[in-house]
């Protein structure tokens, strides 16, 4: 192991639940506005997980007032308070970019049994 691995190991979080693309999650993000800090919830479908180690990221997509919103989060970010997995999705792809073109019921993902 080199020196960077030791530094990265100290920054890794161990309270992250296991989730994969297709899962619906609530990401509780710490937002700082001026001197106040609050928790903002971003609920959506995980469309990708990418990378590994300290640089691992995941992207969550949701529809807000008819407009698609995607947000990418580092998995081990200190700005993430916690992640709740609401439903497990049954998908056959690792990257769900095809959901960007789908609207309404066609964008639904089957739930795992």
Swiss-Prot record:
It comes from the Bacteria. One of its GO terms (cellular component) is cytosolic large ribosomal subunit. Keywords: Ribonucleoprotein, Ribosomal protein. Pfam families: Ribosomal_L19 (PF01245). One of its GO terms (molecular function) is structural constituent of ribosome. GO terms for biological process: translation. Belongs to the bacterial ribosomal protein bL19 family. This protein is located at the 30S-50S ribosomal subunit interface and may play a role in the structure and function of the aminoacyl-tRNA binding site. This is Large ribosomal subunit protein bL19. It comes from Mycolicibacterium smegmatis (strain ATCC 700084 / mc(2)155) (Mycobacterium smegmatis).
